[in-house]
């Protein structure tokens, strides 16, 4: 088993200087490079045009420390196809161009989700119409970025907490077969992209949602549906990092080729929690990478809980230094 050197945690509280500018952060080698040295594919974060242009510190940190980018909002349905058949890609183009020009892998997020869905989609009641709309959306978005996206979150948050399938417009109108339709369409458009199913609250082995994900994915794989990976968002409360290892092992048992932590943030950003999560991925062979859901606390969707690796002044926090010192 690969283990972070937990003794390095002691260094965090013995005079760590966390108030220096970004260009004098402690890590002389990026945390992405350190993570890759353990055989993983990336340690990444998110971005979009607003956060990449609001100041110079945010993009500087991304360039220096992270190896992968996920668009926070610009590839979601409401951003890319607000009206039927009328696509707009200015925001997602900006993110993709930034990532490619700086040598970052890209995770496409997300093709099919019940939220941030335009009303014209959610109001469709005819099965054949919705299937046509679903296929066209996936095909158009993926075609634009074919060959540029490492992995796509094809389906996002389709499970209820009890492990059953959510009553979204896609499930209610098409039925469970929308899962097959979505993944087969995605595979036909870009055969080289990794295709993921992504969800939250997959953070504890034995939890009903984890069990539901595993059992459904096993069934879908047996039916030939081309699911390459399971994404665990991993939005954690304080102290929850220790359960992630067991959860990843459970998800890996579903039989996909890979799994990933896709939207990591942790209330309070304790060093112990972050190290536990990084260890969990290191110790699970199928876990290819971690995406932290934001660079600095002010831009976090849960900013009041200070869940990220950089503070309001874009200085590295103790959790960042825990990872940098221990990898």
From Swiss-Prot:
Any GO molecular function: endo-1,4-beta-xylanase activity
SUPFAM superfamilies: (Trans)glycosidases
Induction: Nucleotide sequences for binding catabolite repression protein CREA were detected in the promoter region.
Positions of transmembrane segments: none
Catalytic reactions of this protein: Endohydrolysis of (1->4)-beta-D-xylosidic linkages in xylans
Secreted as UniProt keyword: yes
Protein's UniProt name: Endo-1,4-beta-xylanase A
Organism: Penicillium canescens
Gene (UniProt): xylA
